[in-house]
């Protein structure tokens, strides 16, 4: 029988579990329920919620009826102006923003009000980063690579406040901070990478290093799953990114005696178990 090692940290993190539970709870009520963007980056969960009457909207402008309407803010969070727009609509607001993300909103708001330049380490077009940018009172700088950090110019003596997308690669964040520190900037470094993310990345790398092949399970739009794939790929050449069991070609695994499995923060446990059972028993 093939040896299969599944990461203990694989699957829903605290913030995602909290957000998903909140949506399912609202779906049981009589109100019309909408999420502002997909609640998490997992197609299976979003489709299941749709069956229960929960619809996805892309913008506050998509709200046509206000009475008996509940709008759920997803775990990634939103800019402050979106919160204000929802309040003006007078709809019922359920804020499922991850508490770790909400903490970043407070940090950047205060730092920018104090006159500091906010540097966000993360993917500029990721919804979490879009939300963080929207809590800065002055324009922040977003970087996601060491080369971008090298190109940053002097800020005229202004103090920098550095934060990170919660799901960013910890090693890359540290490398970027090291580069900015060597430029002699006056900086406040706030390591806002979620502990669960750091633990997940470390464990995934360790398992990949010890396995003949590695499976990374998660939504194709999931940033944290993509980062897991990058980490595992560096440690194990035979690393595969799948969303569900349907994406798995077991013919690729015939010669592998040991297979590691990890999953992104938006991957339900039932999908992980299904893949684990199939790989172990085939």
Which functions belong to the PLM regions below?
Residues 1-282:
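The feature marks the mature, well-folded catalytic cores of soluble enzymes
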